[in-house]
Amino acid sequence: PDAFSDGIDDNIFAKIVACIRVAVPYTGMIISTRESKACREKVLQLGVSQISGGSRTSVGGYVEPEEPDDLTSEQFDVEDKRSLDEVVHWLMDLGFIPSFCTACYREGRTGDRFMSLCKNEQIHNCCLPNALMTLKEYLMDYAAEDTKIAGEKVIAKELEHIPNEKVRGIVIERLKEIADGQRDFRF
């Protein structure tokens, strides 16, 4: 907060996040790597719905490793410097399901269509299955071994929470297909 004349501390920021979640329950809220790990953990518990990890903010940052002494082209300072894999593992340790889902946008479930599914509580028939399938893709393609092990446990546990038996069966089949190399399934 000291870097800006109107900066706020983490406690005020957390209160703002909580107020937004109560006032606008269906809105998406994203927390960036600008915030510390501790701040990010706190606001996740208060209703942040998306979190970044392994962010690079300098030109070419994803192509070439950023050197600690050569960060002059950064767009902003990154406080949480953990890798994406570390953030994914941390989220699972906290009891969250890391999801890389973009299905609603890709299927045109935005605006009124999305809100209708949310208010009727039907979005759950899409979100949990899509979260598990995209997590499985991440585990197969990018995860460190310990993250893979943790992720497989999360998937096995969370499959039980898919209420619709038919949907659960489809997800189980698709998870096997993902393990066999197929990608891009979505509900």
PLM regions: where:
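Conserved C-terminal portion of the radical SAM core fold
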Residues: 1-2, 9-38, 45, 50, ...
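Alpha-helix N-cap and loop-to-helix initiation/capping positions
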Residues: 5-12, 75, 79
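Radical SAM enzyme core and accessory elements
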Residues: 41, 46-49, 55-187
